[in-house]
């Protein structure tokens, strides 16, 4: 049986991640409070942001921007960035 978590994005019990997505306290927080589905959706959204905004993920400004967007995404904040011209299917 898969591990269940109360997903902070969807506000319901869902299948959890298999492991923390990155080391440290923040990674553990996502492991405990984000569903596998929500994490996959974030990875897709992050990839879109990186490509459309031509971010260099090695630059501190880009890392900070993505961290801020990740928090907004999982908190269902309306101000999360969308790629220009992007329309959800």
Curated annotation (Swiss-Prot):
Pfam families assigned to the protein according to its UniProt record, in alphabetical order: Iron_traffic
Coiled coil residues, start to end: none
UniProt GO MF annotations: iron ion binding
Domain of life: Bacteria
InterPro entries the record matches: Fe_traffick_prot_YggX, Fe_traffick_prot_YggX_sf
One GO CC term, this protein: cytosol
GO biological process, one term: cellular response to oxidative stress
Keyword vocabulary terms for this entry: Iron
The protein's role, per its UniProt record: Could be a mediator in iron transactions between iron acquisition and iron-requiring processes, such as synthesis and/or repair of Fe-S clusters in biosynthetic enzymes.
Similarity comment: Belongs to the Fe(2+)-trafficking protein family.
Name of the protein in question: Probable Fe(2+)-trafficking protein
Organism: Acinetobacter baumannii (strain SDF)
Upper lineage: Bacteria, Pseudomonadati, Pseudomonadota, Gammaproteobacteria, Moraxellales
């Amino acid at each position: 049986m898969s591990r269940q978590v109360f997903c902070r994005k969807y506000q319901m019990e869902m299948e959890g991640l298999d492991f923390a997505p990155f080391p440290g306290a923040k990674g553990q927080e996502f492991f405990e409070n984000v569903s596998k589905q929500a994490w996959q959706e974030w990875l897709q959204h992050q990839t879109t942001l990186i490509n459309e905004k031509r971010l260099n993920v090695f630059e501190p400004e880009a890392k900070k921007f993505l961290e801020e967007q990740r928090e907004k995404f999982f908190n269902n904040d309306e101000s999360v960035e969308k790629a220009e011209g992007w329309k959800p299917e």
